[in-house]
């Protein structure tokens, strides 16, 4: 089944309450609380909703923002962006291209070589270390 065709009920049944709030309701993890914020294992980060590969460990960096930050996705085609004008300010929302789940936001204040900071909610992610053991 195409994840974009899942019903809200199906999402609610298949996700943890935290992941459902972030991915389907566009929520936000409280700053500094996510399990991947201070996380430095070698591996890859996947969408918690559908398993789409999103980020590699070697693009993660400490931004001081309170959320896991990456300077680029594995493939641009694995994410989508759209304008978000909630909270009375203009931002760029980052979505999983496979399931449409809300991941976080991207800002233009990141490190070289991209100058981008993908600020991603831990609850929207699933980590697998290099040996493919799920964490």
State the predicted function of each range.
Residues 2-135:
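A short Gly-Trp-Pro
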């Amino acid at each position: 089944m195409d994840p974009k065709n899942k019903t809200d009920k199906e999402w609610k049944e298949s996700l943890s309450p935290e992941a459902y709030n972030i991915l389907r309701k566009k929520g936000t993890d409280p700053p500094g609380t996510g399990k991947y914020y201070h996380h430095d294992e070698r591996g890859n980060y996947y969408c918690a909703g559908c398993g789409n590969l999103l980020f590699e460990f070697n693009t993660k960096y400490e931004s001081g923002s309170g959320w896991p930050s990456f300077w680029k996705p594995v493939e641009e085609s694995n994410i989508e962006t759209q304008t978000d004008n909630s909270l009375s300010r203009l931002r760029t929302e980052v979505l999983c291209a496979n399931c449409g789940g809300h991941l976080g936001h991207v800002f233009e204040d990141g490190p070289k070589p991209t100058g981008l900071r993908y600020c991603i909610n831990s609850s929207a992610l699933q980590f697998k270390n290099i040996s493919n053991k799920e964490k």
